[in-house]
């Protein structure tokens, strides 16, 4: 028996499976390493040393996380804490608002043109402005 993910599984489904296995949560980096170890076909299996590979991998993971959070909240199943330092499934609590209506980060990561239109020069500018 193999622990590899089925290729037809969506990245959000793969992430959900990983998060269910670790209720304490994990960092984004740990999540990426676990996806690679289970041969996810949705993220590049390349070292994260290249800035463009790092950006694209990060973007794909965060896109999947925001889609998963919306799905789980819509199904009244879980809330999802999303941060590079800790991604964690949390209990759904009726009457609370886990999904913010105007969330610029959510909007950014759900817009796939941001992935497609960001080249190496733009990644350099983003990293320079971040640090």
Where are these regions (language model features)?
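Short "pre-J" leader segments immediately N-terminal to J/J-like domains in DnaJ-family
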Residues: 2-131
């Amino acid at each position: 028996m193999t622990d590899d993910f089925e290729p037809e599984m969506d990245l959000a489904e793969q992430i959900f499976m990983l998060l269910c296995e670790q209720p304490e949560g994990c960092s984004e980096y740990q999540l990426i390493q676990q996806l690679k170890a289970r041969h996810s076909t949705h993220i590049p299996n390349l070292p994260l040393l290249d800035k463009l590979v790092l950006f694209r991998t990060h973007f794909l993971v965060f896109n999947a996380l925001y889609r998963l959070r919306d799905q789980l909240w819509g199904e009244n199943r879980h809330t999802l804490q999303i941060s590079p330092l800790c991604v964690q499934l949390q209990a759904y609590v009726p009457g609370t608002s886990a999904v913010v209506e105007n969330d610029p980060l959510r909007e950014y990561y759900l817009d796939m043109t941001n992935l497609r239109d960001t080249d190496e020069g733009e990644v350099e500018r983003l990293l320079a402005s971040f640090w």
